[in-house]
Amino acid sequence: MEELTVEVRGSNGAYYKGFVRDVHDDSLSISFENNWQPERQVPFSDVRLPPSADTKKEIGEGEEVEIFSRANEQEPCGWWLAKVRMMKGDFYVIEYAACDATYNEIVTFERLRPVNRNKAVTESTFFRCSVPVPEDLRAACESEQAHKEFKKAVGAIRIVYSPEKSELVVLSLSEATVKRVSLLSDIHLRSIRTKLMLMSRNQEATKHLESTKQLASAFQEEFTVREDLMGLAIGSHGSNIQQARKVPGVTAIELEEETGTFRIYGESTEAVQKARNYLEFLEDSVQIPRNLVGKVIGKNGKVIQEIVDKSGVVRVRIEGDNDNKLPRQEGMVPFTFVGTKESISNVQVLLEYHIAYLNEVEQLRLERLQIDEQLRQIGMGFRSVPNRPADKEKGFGPDESSSGSIHTQRSYRGRGRRGPAHTSAYGTNSEHSYTSETDSERKAELSDWSLAADESERNPRPQRDSRRRDLRGRGRGSRGRGASNSISSVLKDPDGNPYSLLDNTETDQTADTDGSESQMNTSRRRRSRRRRTDEDTTVMDGMSESDNASLSENGLVTVADYISRAESQSRQTNPRDTRKSKKDMTRGDFISEHSAAESVSNGPNNADEPSESAKAVVNGVS
């Protein structure tokens, strides 16, 4: 920058080049060329202005001139007063006095100049003014280059910033400069502020350019986030971006808000990918089978809430039937999740596992239902073929047992009650039980045919069907007729509905004394048995006749009727026949009772030890 140059007189009388730094009341702050002397204050009397540049250089012999020379090697060159002694071509012989000595020297014209006629400066030679600088502009005003245009505009010789006083010092040789400074100082400071801001932006842009050039060869990731998910990606007050920038190895993150594009730069692929996981939010749907939607949601949304919490997704939306935003598969319901890419992957894994678990549970449930159905079919399926006489003789034990196993809460009996420890023969599906029941039925059937004539004379009510009831039941009361008739109907039509026992039982309990029903059931019982000879009557026939005869006038059968009937028959029958009939009846009842118990317990056949209850019933004790 152009300096205010002056000439300072030294102690040897030579004038040396110097620069004015500041103006004081009676002196100037002067700095010297090449700093051969330190900056110091010089009085006005020792300072003069240099000659103007347009001064004519016409030198002749005998004239006084000034020579640019030095007295010794330690001092710089200065202007000394000299005299031309001789001229020869471009060379001059000069004589000058220095340090109390006279020197002669041959020099060229460039080292000579006419004598400087400028006098020493005074207080009025220089004009000084100052401009206060705001605090935010002090650093910018330290550079003299910032005042280049201002100096030119005001016509100042020098403008410098004084850190001690925080002001701009303007030096000039004209008084007009002071007026111009007062006019342009505010504009100059404002322009400095604007230029400072622009320079700052330029510096940032330059740094960004340099960093971009460096990052261009580094690792980077670029992805786009939907406009409606930008808020989640940025986070509250930019928390997600700040968290991504704190990832070790991430150097820069750029965001184009117009397009929703993120650019992540880093030192490694792992660092860039980790930062991307914080910022990349998306929406994805998972297809759930319609029959599993309720189980996936859970009671009060407990299951789906647990899945959301564990996966880390932001929210979940279940698409309705009327929503057509997403493609829908047949029989499937879309579950739409919003979250980071990692959380979406987590929720897909959780749902796939949960659906697989629900399918396995459903498969196990179906297998259980199939097993139960097979058990029912096994219980109902051992029906005898009508064309095989052997099966007819064995009876239909499995049908009766299956009906008992299906309706476990209801017992298929009439009015008579049984003990709580009694187990019906209809309730087992065991092969041993079936075999023992068949054998006992054969024995009971033989005993029934052998005792048919005697039982027709005696009371037939307790001997109605020894295979289908417990001997203990005779002492407590007779069973309803409906149960015997219903069982007879099942025996007659094994291919029919075995559950008709329930209907017949209910009917017999409500209308037990219906005469027409009794006659119809009697005819069924008669047809259900095969006679061995045409002359013999079956046990069912005898029981049917006795049943018809035992009806009272009002159609009800009481225990007293059985007791009185038994006493009257015992009086009419001789003791020998009575003992014989009792003995035969006991033997037949023992066989049938033992077979029923065997079918229930599936234990060994203890036919040789009749129960005490059977004896008690035979003796007529209830």
Swiss-Prot record:
Location of the Agenet-like domain: 4-50, 63-115
Listed GO MF terms: molecular condensate scaffold activity; mRNA 3'-UTR AU-rich region binding; mRNA 3'-UTR binding; mRNA binding; translation regulator activity
Compositional bias (Basic and acidic residues): 455-468, 574-596
Record's subcellular location: Cytoplasm, Cytoplasmic ribonucleoprotein granule; Cytoplasm
Biased composition (Basic residues): 410-420, 469-479
Effect of loss of the gene: Morpholino knockdown of the protein causes abnormalities of striated muscle development and abnormal development of the heart, including failure of looping and snapping of the atrium from its venous pole.
Recorded superkingdom: Eukaryota
Posttranslational modification: Phosphorylation at Ser-447 by PAK1 promotes its activity.
Main subcellular location of this protein, as a coarse class: cytoplasm
Pfam families, per database record: Agenet, FXMRP1_C_core, FXR_C1, FXR_C3, KH_1, KH_9, Tudor_FRX1
Residues in KH domain copies: 218-279, 281-351
UniProt keyword list: Cytoplasm, Myogenesis, Phosphoprotein, Repeat, RNA-binding
Biased composition (Polar residues): 400-409, 425-437, 545-555
Entry-annotated residues carrying Phosphoserine: 447
Any one GO biological process: negative regulation of long-term synaptic potentiation
GO CC annotation: cytoplasmic stress granule; intracellular membraneless organelle; neuron projection; nucleus; presynapse
Positions with biased composition (Acidic residues): 505-515
Ranges where the record places region CC2 domain: 353-379
Keyword S-adenosyl-L-methionine on entry: no
Family: Belongs to the FMR1 family.
Domain remarks: Disordered region at the C-terminus undergoes liquid-liquid phase separation (LLPS) for the formation of a membraneless compartment that stores mRNAs.
Name assigned to this protein: RNA-binding protein FXR1
Source organism of this protein record: Danio rerio
